[in-house]
């Protein structure tokens, strides 16, 4: 489709009308360029897909929404906007699209959040009820559907009242009533515990109401994980050929795709035996009480028992073999080098893939049959069986995918990382098996790049080390396929608005020197606080261990510090805003993930402190396997993995400072390697052009460590 004069005029008219809706709107050349580039790509005038880096201040959201809506209307397609997290998804849904609706009154839009973000009306009704009979009726579903106390019941009753009177849409983030994680776990549901069309509340269920709204909407706001799942199952979203897709925060896409394809499952032999026994009893109950018209051969008791017995024997053998590979001790891990399994393990995985797939098919067949049963049956008993079969299907589906992935030598031209872990829970040892591909470009090509005609991938940061090469390698986007890569200029004058401060630290921030380095960092930070030059500050760490140690050095400043983990992030930011608005000093402290998407302008944030260059962890099974693979190709892992990742992280962290033309301040980076190592210049060259200062550092007095047992974290 060509960009007609009428279409261009429509885009220009909306852009002009938008300027009148936004106070102090500043026209920006990069924004106009982005609108033009997005329009050309979505209309098919230039290239296949577009990766466009739009630095903070460009106004990228409105720059893709305006041309996206215009072209979607012209082509009678649906514009799907996907983000990496719920916060940005909600911002687009609750702020940006309502703003556009002022200039496009008939605009229809909705949001597609994951099932776990919505309340389950069945669970809410039970938890809000004061009638024991109501709770008893729903308790048959094996869920914890009774309130813990009267206060919790009253809270649920208020939520139910808001839902029933349409004051609340059922989304966790859209109510002012405090809901802790434990209560929300009982209020929401997952795919395995949902009765779907068989539920009494199906028609009014917020999740399914939202899904039905997708069919009528011109714009759907989703997230990357949901889009990947929708493309895989060909459900939820319209047909790919009838889509225009924008992937905001597109730098997350390869990781989200990899997470979606990562498979982990418990394979502890006694636990597995129990699951198989429960499934055979479940099948027997279905055959006895809800006999299907056509009996699957595998459902015959003798055959099913033999099938499950073979499956169990293979799992037991695998347990024995894996325990031999793992080091002694209750908690242990073994990774298979280059993802290559021994022949005996590979043969077991291949057979397990076939056997679990057959059980998955059997569970699906019974579930479909049960779902079609009429009201002539005992509805309580039927629904109980549907839920149990649904959960069995979920288990065998995951197992089937795991063993299929374990049987693969490569995925997307790279090895599949495979490892086993043993851990202790409540005095019992549990064995797990894990698989994840280190490259997902083939899957992205199949699900996205080849399926959807034109896609926009955008973010404030898509490049690392001034190059799109890492994005291209990880995502599979490539110029020879007609994909375009554009980096827009920043609208800000960084040279005049801020500066980078690299204190003259006495040591590098290595593990060996960590204690002295943090002592010096704390001393310099204290000096900055005492200067009273900045009201709003942000301190970012590469690890929780370092952050905790830093806090040990500044205990007298603790009341000023708002630390990640003390409260949910949005509450910390809310409190920070209130403090600064009242003229008080406030310091946000967290890990690098805490800063992503943080938008604090002016005095709210005028000094950012960065503990050190954040290289990725090198002890993750995925990173180790990728390193082995790169070395086998005579490529240098530091150049391919570590440095691009560190560059990307640093750009993101530094980008927290200048968010508008009125922002000012300093970025303090406590890492002398930026000036002493060869790669330091490359990292600095990829940052906005700030003047650099190198002040002296007060001597830090090293404190003695208190001996504490560090919690074991699960690696991947």
UniProtKB/Swiss-Prot annotation:
GO terms for molecular function: 4 iron, 4 sulfur cluster binding; 5'-3' DNA helicase activity; ATP binding; ATP hydrolysis activity; catalytic activity, acting on a nucleic acid; DNA binding; DNA helicase activity; DNA/RNA helicase activity. Its cofactor is [4Fe-4S] cluster; Mg(2+). Signal peptide: none annotated. Disruption phenotype: Knockout results in a slight reduction of UV resistance. Knockout mutants are sensitive to very high levels of chain-terminating nucleoside analog 3' azidothymidine (AZT). Increased genetic instability of G-quadruplex DNA. Changing residue 199 to S: Abolishes iron-sulfur-binding. Changing residue 618 to A: Loss of helicase activity, loss of ssDNA binding. The keyword Iron-sulfur applies. Induction: DNA damage-inducible. Transcriptionally regulated by LexA. Changing residue 673 to A: Loss of helicase activity, loss of ssDNA binding. Binds 1 [4Fe-4S] cluster. The iron-sulfur cluster is essential for protein stability and helicase activity. Changing residue 120 to S: Abolishes iron-sulfur-binding. It catalyses: Couples ATP hydrolysis with the unwinding of duplex DNA at the replication fork by translocating in the 5'-3' direction. This creates two antiparallel DNA single strands (ssDNA). The leading ssDNA polymer is the template for DNA polymerase III holoenzyme which synthesizes a continuous strand; ATP + H2O = ADP + phosphate + H(+). GO terms for biological process: DNA repair; SOS response. Residues 262-438 are annotated as: Arch domain. Residues 492-716 are annotated as: HD2 domain. Its EC number is 5.6.2.3. Residues 17-294 form the Helicase ATP-binding domain. ATPase activity is 15-fold stimulated by single-stranded DNA (ssDNA). Reduction of the [4Fe-4S] cluster reversibly switches off helicase activity. Remains fully active after exposure to 100-fold excess of hydrogen peroxide, but the [4Fe-4S] cluster can be efficiently modified by nitric oxide (NO), forming the DinG-bound dinitrosyl iron complex with the concomitant inactivation of helicase activity. Helicase activity on G-quadruplex DNA is inhibited by porphyrin derivatives meso-tetra (N-methyl-4-pyridyl) porphine tetra tosylate (T4) and N-methyl mesoporphyrin IX (NMM). Residues 115-216 are annotated as: [4Fe-4S] domain. ATP binds at residues 26, 31, 60-61, 599, 656, 659. Has 4 domains; the discontinous helicase 1 (HD1), helicase 2 (HD2), arch and Fe-S cluster domains. The arch domain sits above the other domains and contacts the Fe-S cluster domain above the ssDNA-binding surface. Addition of an ATP analog to a DinG-ssDNA crystal induces changes in the relative orientation of the domains; HD1 remains tightly bound while HD2 slides along the DNA, upon ATP hydrolysis HD1 slides while HD2 remains tightly bound, thus the enzyme translocates in a 5'-3' direction along the ssDNA. DNA-dependent ATPase and 5'-3' DNA helicase. Can also unwind DNA:RNA hybrid duplexes. Is active on D-loops, R-loops, and on forked structures. Unwinds G-quadruplex DNA in a 5'-3' direction; unwinding efficiency differs on different substrates. Does not appear to unwind replication forks or Holliday junctions. Translocates on single-stranded (ss)DNA with a 5'-3' polarity. In vitro at high concentrations also unwinds in a 3'-5' direction. May be involved in recombinational DNA repair and the resumption of replication after DNA damage. HAMAP family: DinG_proteobact. This is ATP-dependent DNA helicase DinG. It comes from Escherichia coli (strain K12). The lineage of its organism: Bacteria, Pseudomonadati, Pseudomonadota, Gammaproteobacteria, Enterobacterales.
């Amino acid at each position: 489709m060509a960009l007609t004069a009428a279409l261009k005029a429509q885009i220009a008219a909306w852009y002009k009308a938008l300027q009148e809706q936004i106070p102090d709107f500043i026209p920006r050349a990069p924004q106009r360029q982005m609108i033009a580039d997005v329009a050309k790509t979505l209309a098919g005038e230039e290239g296949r897909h577009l990766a466009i880096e739009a630095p903070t201040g460009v106004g990228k959201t409105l720059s893709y929404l305006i041309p996206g809506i215009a072209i979607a209307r012209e082509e009678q397609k649906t514009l799907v906007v996907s983000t990496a997290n719920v916060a940005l998804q909600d911002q687009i849904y609750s702020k940006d699209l309502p703003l556009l609706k002022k200039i496009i009154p008939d605009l229809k839009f909705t949001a597609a959040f994951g099932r776990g973000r919505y309340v389950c009306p069945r669970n809410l009704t039970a938890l809000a009820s004061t009638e024991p009979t109501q709770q008893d009726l729903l308790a048959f579903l094996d869920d914890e559907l009774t309130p813990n106390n009267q206060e919790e019941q009253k809270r649920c009753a208020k939520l139910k009242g808001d839902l029933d009177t349409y004051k609340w849409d059922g989304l966790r983030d859209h109510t002012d009533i405090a809901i802790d994680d434990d209560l929300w776990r009982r209020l929401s549901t997952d795919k395995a515990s949902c009765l779907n069309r068989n539920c009494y509340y199906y028609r009014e269920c917020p999740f399914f109401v939202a899904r039905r709204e997708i069919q009528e909407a011109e714009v759907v706001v989703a997230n990357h994980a949901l889009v990947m799942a929708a493309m895989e199952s060909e459900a939820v979203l319209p047909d790919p050929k009838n889509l225009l897709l924008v992937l905001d925060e597109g730098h997350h896409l390869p990781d989200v795709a990899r997470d979606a394809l990562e498979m982990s499952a418990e394979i502890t032999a006694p636990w597995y035996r129990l699951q198989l026994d429960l499934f055979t009893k479940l099948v027997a109950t279905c055959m006895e009480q809800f006999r299907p018209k056509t009996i699957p051969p595998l459902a015959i008791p003798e055959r099913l028992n033999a099938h499950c017995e073979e499956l169990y024997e293979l799992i037991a053998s695998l347990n024995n073999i894996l325990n031999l590979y793992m080091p002694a001790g209750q908690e242990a891990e073994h990774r298979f080098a280059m993802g290559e399994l021994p022949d005996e393990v590979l043969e077991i995985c291949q057979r397990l893939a076939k056997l679990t797939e057959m059980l998955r098919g059997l569970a699906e067949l019974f579930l479909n049959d049960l779902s079609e049963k009429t009201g002539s049956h005992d509805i309580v008993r039927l629904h109980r069986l549907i839920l149990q079969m649904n959960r069995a299907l979920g288990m065998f589906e995951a197992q089937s995918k795991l063993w299929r992935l374990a049987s693969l030598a490569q995925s997307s031209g790279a090895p599949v990382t495979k490892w086993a872990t043993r851990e202790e829970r409540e005095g019992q040892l549990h064995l797990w098996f894990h698989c994840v591909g280190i490259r997902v470009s083939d899957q992205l090509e199949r699900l996205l790049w080849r399926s959807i005609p034109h896609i926009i991938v955008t973010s404030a940061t898509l490049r690392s080390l001034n190059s799109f090469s890492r994005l291209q390698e990880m995502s599979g986007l490539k110029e020879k396929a007609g994909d375009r890569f554009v980096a827009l200029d920043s609208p800000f004058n960084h040279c005049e608005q801020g500066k980078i401060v690299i204190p003259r630290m006495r040591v590098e921030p290595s593990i060996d020197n960590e204690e002295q380095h943090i002592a010096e960092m704390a001393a310099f930070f204290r000096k900055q606080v005492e200067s009273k030059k900045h009201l709003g500050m942000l301190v970012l760490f590469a690890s929780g261990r370092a952050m905790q140690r830093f806090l040990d050095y500044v205990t007298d400043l603790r009341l000023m510090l708002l630390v990640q983990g003390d409260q949910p992030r949005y509450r910390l930011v809310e409190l920070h805003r209130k403090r600064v608005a009242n003229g008080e000093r406030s310091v946000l402290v967290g890990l690098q993930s805490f800063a992503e998407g943080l938008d604090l302008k002016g005095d709210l944030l005028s000094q950012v402190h960065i503990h050190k260059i954040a290289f990725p962890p090198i002890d993750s099974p995925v990173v180790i396997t990728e390193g082995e693979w790169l070395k086998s190709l005579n490529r240098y892992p530091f150049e391919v993995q570590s440095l691009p990742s560190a560059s990307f992280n640093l750009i993101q962290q530094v980008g927290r400072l200048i968010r508008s033309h009125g922002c000012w301040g300093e970025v303090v980076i406590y890492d002398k390697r930026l000036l002493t190592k060869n790669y330091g210049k490359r990292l600095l060259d990829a940052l906005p052009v700030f003047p650099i200062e190198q002040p002296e550092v007060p001597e830090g007095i090293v404190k003695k460590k208190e001996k504490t047992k560090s919690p074991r974290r699960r690696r991947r």
